[in-house]
Amino acid sequence: RASRGMGELCSAAGLKVTFVVIPTDMEIHGAIYRELEAQGHEVGLHIHPGEQGYDEFFGVYGYEEQIGILREGIEVFAQQMGRKPECFTPGYFSANDHTFPALEAVGLRHGLVSCPTRNLPQCACVWGNSPLDAHYPHRHNRCLTGDVDFVDVPVTIDPDSRLWGGAHPQDLRVELVDAKNHFYTIEKGVKRQLTAGDAT
């Protein structure tokens, strides 16, 4: 009900959004996500390995293990949506240097994987000063740009405003802060892009 309501609100405002869905939710609510896709919204794959019976965060696993976890999720997604996903987001932004090549190997094309400056090793989520803007990731180092055929669109952050004892940057999740703080995060991001000359 919440996903359908969010889709209706966004459609009424003339917006198209991306819903990333864990396989267990897709199995139960596939019809809702097919409706949302028919309205022009994007539906992609979201992985929390624990929801698939695994013990660790996604970024703890090696290349072959990540491919296996992804393929399990892709199979469920394809059964419900009638197609394979192209978009992907890992739970907790958990990833390692195997992740982008693994995403490429299973045919995923784009998504929100990185959270620049986030430092939560307990979630296998360490992003350092990774790129703030959309980019092709490096094949051997997740924090650099490179030639992996996957477009990473990092979460919008304010690297100067820190949460959780400094481990996490302010981002645009609605549950974190109020609209005024989100305005500042957006404003700073736009000004940064304009100053750098890379806003298009």
Identify the meaning behind each predicted range:
Residues A13-N96, V148, I157-P159:
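Metal-dependent polysaccharide deacetylase catalytic core of the NodB/CE4 family, i.e.
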Residues R1-E8:
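N-terminal regions that are enriched for targeting/export leaders
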Residues P90-T200:
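Active-site-adjacent pocket scaffolds in enzyme catalytic domains
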